[in-house]
């Protein structure tokens, strides 16, 4: 715990309604900071006020008055109302947890930058989104008192594409919500199967948005190759928000009719442990992540995980997951090997769950408190 505790205003207005990775980061961090006794105020969209009241019962929660539902409205609010709010609340630090930040705030500023793929793999994002986040990343690196990144890989990637030194970035790993992501009970597995309509069919699981960097077309093609000649093939279940990867439909159309690929769409949070932990294995052949929360969450559920060595994923998986290349052939070979070897899957699942225990939101909250104190100290020296 830091010696002199700054008061921190956390801007949770950028959290999308479906939560996603940034939502899980902000929600879990706020809860852990509150439990740790940090001096925080959370400003959020009105729809999230009750949630943050529950997550942070010791802290002040302030819903926005004017609309921040669209990106333009939120940015306008961030640049005008948020600095006034920081002044009124006498906040020492404003934490902006998703790239953008108020440029005229009286407080010290901490900005979380989640990954560098807007620079390194811009084609994996829409062009508008890539330009927007590139511009704000550069601005945050130049203007913020301190920038937080979730992995060594992200720090190194940002150092390559901007003028920042990796050592100047605060590397703070995410944790995992063990109440939500845990070894599922048989009832939880059954409930997840019922939600998907699977019956008793074994399945390979994927959880994430269907966007290009998740590499879902290669997963679909690799899965089809791996299981086509099996007498009793498992299903492939794609769970998560629909994205904008146009190649997914083409890959699905090419799947032989005797194989089952299920697009489960958005699954309620209370079914995720059963979905991940009840699978034969979780496949996540991503082209690159800033951290890799879906991999960590699957590990915490006691799943055997197959992922890639791209960017931060080995920092999360260590020796407790299986790795493959990003091509369909690579995915097919790795899936075949794992499906043929139940004992290896069981060993990896046990190792994954042990490793997942090393990533806690309590530790992340402690490190964020140190970052807030450092940012506040820098800000006072600069005035």
Task: Give, region by region, the residue ranges found by the protein language model.
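Carbohydrate transferase catalytic cores enriched for Leloir-type hexosyltransferases
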Residues: 1-383
